Amino acid sequence: MAFLGVPYGRPYRGLGPELPSATAPAALRAASLAFQPYYWNVDVDFGGDLFAGREVLLADAGDVRLVPGDHTGNLERITTVVRTLLRAGTVPIVLGGDHAVTVPVLQAYAEQTGLCIVQIDAHLDWRDEVDGIREGFSSPMRRASELSSVHAMVQIGLRGAGSGREEEFAAARTWGSVLVPARTVHREGIEWVLDRLPQASAYYVTLDADGIDPGIMPGVNAPAPGGLTYWQVFDLLCGIAHRGQIVGFDLTELAPARDPSGVTVAHAVRILLVLIGALAHAGQFG
């Protein structure tokens, strides 16, 4: 498993020169140091060893070198680095950056077949374009649906009035995406959601931090009330890992500067550890 930083926050017109999510990879690395002394303690959430007694190799692949203002070139650089990690036989864990980074990451999976995308997000992200930009943070699921490697999609945690227009929801449903509003998650539970997860040869999980309730993680680009809880995300990641192979993961839209307390980043680091634990306990290591 290799952690890859993509400190990219290219906004649309009128949103300033750069989104605060560009600083997230560095903030996540710094916050992870606080957890380091405790990795080998009993992890109560997993009922014992986080790594399930397995040899788990973790590497930090650094950050993708990005060139300010070179949007197209930066996307290509991201794809190239992720493809290199995949061909080395590792599972990329991508630390964004805004949600636009998911597009070039998924393009690196061109050799994968039967991929199911599991998105945790307050927003639908099916815009075809915004300000003439087709690979921005409002469009990753639309672009994912166009990839030959992707055959299914589940979008979990949708809520609020800003998630998408009727035309985007219609396009997502027509394509076949399974849409699960946050209120449905709270009412029916995670097992209900997992029962609706399509069978797939592999799963890719993309977690937009605003998919989690802002009472837990307030430091995000677009907070929306009513999001998922830590335990729901915990059970979801563990459930996916037991249903099939997780071949990649990204965490996007963190805005560390909007939460000086550091609680948001601390929660995010814990979720990354949960992902590792979920994979280990599902037997996807060693």
Model regions: which residues?
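Conserved alpha-helical scaffold segments that buttress catalytic/binding sites
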Residues: M1-G286
